Design a protein with these regions (language model features):
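Cross-family detector of peptidyl-prolyl cis-trans isomerase
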Residues: 1-202
Length: 202
């Protein structure tokens, strides 16, 4: 274990911040492995980080590649299985509901039928609820004004268009459909199932 470092000079602060950011990437990988049911030996992992920085690796390049590729293959298999299970869950959850549009694993579902179609320049208020499929909130409910145009983000554009004025649309999807990998919140993994509810009013 490295000795405690003084964090006083600009160089020390910059270096410390770099270390924290690096560790956040490692923690994200560990959370994914745990969610896939894979065990991790944290002591060995930290030893690998320290040995790499110190230039004293205990494996040659061939051994490193073989072991890392074996882990990556195992993670890939389990992740694919998790996505397959999730897609099946989405399909069973949406059975009997009115699916207005499907884009791969993203489903736009009618909850409340709207009235007039929405046109460019319309001023609207959108109420958004974000939750997991089991109903647990991912973020606080919020309402926001918007001027409708073709340039607003895809999911918002489609939800508003399909909901129409006075309507409500639910969007069911994987977390990875909504977030790029580098922006995924720490509380989520890519194959978590989410539900977004968009209610549109004037």
């Amino acid at each position: 274990t490295a000795a405690p470092a003084a964090i006083q000079t600009p160089l020390q602060r910059h270096s410390y911040a770099a270390g924290i950011i690096l560790s956040e990437g490692i923690e994200k990988s560990l959370r994914l492995q745990k969610s896939l049911g894979l065990e991790v030996d944290k002591n060995a992992l930290l030893a690998g980080v320290n040995d790499s920085i110190a230039g004293s690796r205990k494996m040659d390049t061939k051994q490193l590649n073989e072991n890392y590729e074996a882990l990556a293959e195992k993670m890939s298999e389990k992740e694919k299985a998790a996505y397959d299970r999730g897609f099946a869950t989405l399909q069973s959850t949406l059975s009997g509901k009115t699916v207005l549009k499907q884009n791969q694993s993203m489903f736009f579902v009618e909850k409340k039928k709207g009235g007039a179609a929405i046109k460019n320049g319309d001023k609207l208020t959108v109420r958004l609820t974000q939750s997991r499929l089991d109903g647990k909130a991912v973020a606080p409910q919020k309402s926001f004004p918007i001027v409708y145009s073709d340039s607003i983000p895809y999911v918002l554009n489609q939800a508003i268009t399909l909901a129409k004025k006075g309507g409500t649309v639910e969007v069911y999807c994987f977390a990875s459909d909504m977030y790029p990998a580098e922006m995924l919140p720490s509380s989520l993994v890519g194959f978590d199932l989410l539900k977004y509810t968009f209610s549109v009013s004037k």
